[in-house]
């Protein structure tokens, strides 16, 4: 089916282009959401009359989206989750969690604007794209950590997995040294020998 795009659609085309798409995509996505019109002779004429109005609306929406993009561009959002020692989350960080983090800061974005292919399932710093407008896209950092202290260490660039391993090794060394130099343990050994 041929359709006329009423706005820019990712991986499809710009506003005003006539593109050929599968019937199901047009009927179930583009047409109901007002992103396209069927490419009939009548609709082509209507589009030419509507084109100036659509371009003005698109420009206003793009300016508003640019203001929002300036607020969130490069922002770092911290999401706290429980995780295993290896850094694997018990659960995941989804689009809904990212939206809630921005809402806590007073910034409203919709689920369709967050471009997250798969849910985040590991601790660390992750780059996520947000399309505030079809023509305006920004990148934000999402730091997933077990605690606020750990999130700060991740943001400073420290490798938390080695820190945890170093702490475990240090604790084992202290425990071994404590057993080696424990004066009570020495007296117990002498008492058992007699």
UniProtKB/Swiss-Prot annotation:
GO terms (BP aspect): translation
Xref: InterPro entries: Ribosomal_bL9, Ribosomal_bL9/RNase_H1_N, Ribosomal_bL9_bac/chp, Ribosomal_bL9_C, Ribosomal_bL9_C_sf, Ribosomal_bL9_N, Ribosomal_bL9_N_sf
Gene3D superfamilies (UniProt xref): Ribosomal protein L9, C-terminal domain, Ribosomal protein L9, N-terminal domain
Pfam family, one: Ribosomal_L9_C
Family indicated by similarity: Belongs to the bacterial ribosomal protein bL9 family.
Function: Binds to the 23S rRNA.
Protein name (Swiss-Prot/TrEMBL): Large ribosomal subunit protein bL9
Taxonomic source organism: Rhodopseudomonas palustris (strain BisA53)
Lineage: Bacteria, Pseudomonadati, Pseudomonadota, Alphaproteobacteria, Hyphomicrobiales
